[in-house]
Structures are given as C-alpha cells and as structure tokens.
Amino acid sequence: MTALDAPRGRPELSWRKPWWLVVLGLMLGFGLVQEQSKIKVNHYLQVGDAEQFWDQNAQERESWWQASAPVGRHNFYVSRATWTVFHSFSRGQLVAFKWGLSGLILLVFFILDVLLLRSTGVAERVPWLVVIYVTAGIPMLGLGFSSPGEAWYALARDMLGFLQSPLPSVMVVLVPWFLDRMASSRPGT
C-alpha cells in the first residue's frame, strides 16, 4: 500500500521506508540543539544585565566571562559556555539576535512538520498545520509586549515550546486517524 491509496485519515507509517522516523529523529535532534542555543542566549542576557558589562568591549567581556561567568542552570542544562560572537553584540543586538533565532527555529520546525506530513502520506493536511501555527502564534505575539513573570508571557512561552516540538505535526497525522478508528469501532457503523 502506498501513501496515495492509503485509506482516508490513515497515515502510512511504514517500517520498510521509515522516512517518518528519520524526520522525527531530525525534529528531536534539532529540538535539543535549538533549546541549548536559546539557553545560551538567555543566560548571556541575564549575566550581562546582572553585571552591567554592556559598555565593555568584546575583549574585556570575553576575559571577564572566562574568569568570572556564573554557571547557568536551566532544568537539566548546566553550562558556563557561551558563543564568542555574543561578546561583540550590544544588548539590543543580542535581543534582536534572539528574536531572529526564534523566528528561524520556528521556520525550521514548520518545514520539518511539513516533511513529517509528507513522509506519512498525509500532505493534504498541511492547511491544518497552518491553522495550528496561526492559532498558537496569536498568544506568542504577547512575548513582544510582556516580560517574564507575567501570565501572558508564560502562555506565549508555552505556545512557542509547543510549536518548537514534533507535537503539531504528530497531532495532525494521528488525531484524524484515531477519530476514524473510534467512529468505525462503534456498534452499527
């Protein structure tokens, strides 16, 4: 059975050609890398704000960082390391970099989500994926207008975390299939 003649609502999760599994692996691997990247940016911003070293030049900041930077702890990530390029950014440039990085990460996850739909033979559901991204994106606009600790900020971060995971495409692939199975298992259908 190919993806084209698969029953409506049923994804093709072939073990002979497990492209869907490769895409899921890419999503999980990229998710780990992007999470570590965002933690590095946020840690550098927090340390920079606490130490007020934004007026120092790149060499002074790098020397200070190597000698005195605190260890960053976020859930199970523990690190002092940072990217050297951060030392040459002003605070405003680093915030712009953070937003650009978040946008790029969302774009990559959207592409991976579409690839998962295609690899499971349900590419016709891409519009549903777009609806999920737009719906989850509305609260994310709050990130630009709120600050950590506010309820809107927490909701927006949760929505961002949802989009930066395999969950949107996995939902679009599996939920219709589960609904069809439930409907067909009812007596009298």
Regions flagged by a language model, labelled:
Residues 20, 122-133:
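Membrane-interfacial loop-to-transmembrane alpha-helix junctions, especially the N-terminal start
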Residues 72-107:
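Individual transmembrane alpha-helix segments
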